[in-house]
Amino acid sequence: HARLTAAVAARHGLGCELVLSKLVPRTTENYTENGNVLLMRNFGAKLHILEPGSDSKAYARQLMRELRMARRKPYFIPFGGSSVMGALGYVECAREINSQLAAQDLRADQVFCTTGSGGTQAGLVAGFAAAGSTARVQGISVLFPQERIAPVVAGIANGVLMMLGHSPQ
């Protein structure tokens, strides 16, 4: 997600400051200086790489204050792009899945997806609900325990439903 954000910012001539947390316990130079890190730097992004356990949200809030004081106009994109706005693309994904199922005269009882920061699952939940589908979206968490990610998914999904003019679930 961060790499794509840096690429789009570069393409449109926008500055990009990325607040990243060290979630993977790898410290070799090959890991820390190549791949996505190298690409993000090549796109001109300024990287703020925080140690494990750091409060990245507080850091980002402070960085945004500093950028505003410097007369810049920062726009906050949360971890993984998981927000109501970020989940809207997966509403369209749910519509596409429903369309493909209907074209084959099929019905889904369950749809499975991986869940990291919650946005993909939330968008699918909202998309299927908005379409009146009874398919249950099962997220397989790759990052957080269920009790931590479930309320995040529900909050984003309900925000999407309200944005689309539907009642939250």
PLM region descriptions:
Residues 1-5, 11, 116-124:
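Short glycine/serine/threonine-rich phosphate/pyrophosphate-binding segments
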Residues 3-51, 147-157:
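Active-site-proximal loop->helix
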Residues 7, 11, 99, 126-130:
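Short, well-ordered alpha-helices that flank and scaffold nucleotide-derived cofactor binding pockets
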Residues 23-104, 169:
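Small/polar-residue-rich loop-to-helix segments that shape phosphate-bearing ligand pockets
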Residues 105-109:
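Short helix-loop-beta connector
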Residues 132-169:
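Active-site/ligand-binding loops adjacent to catalytic centers
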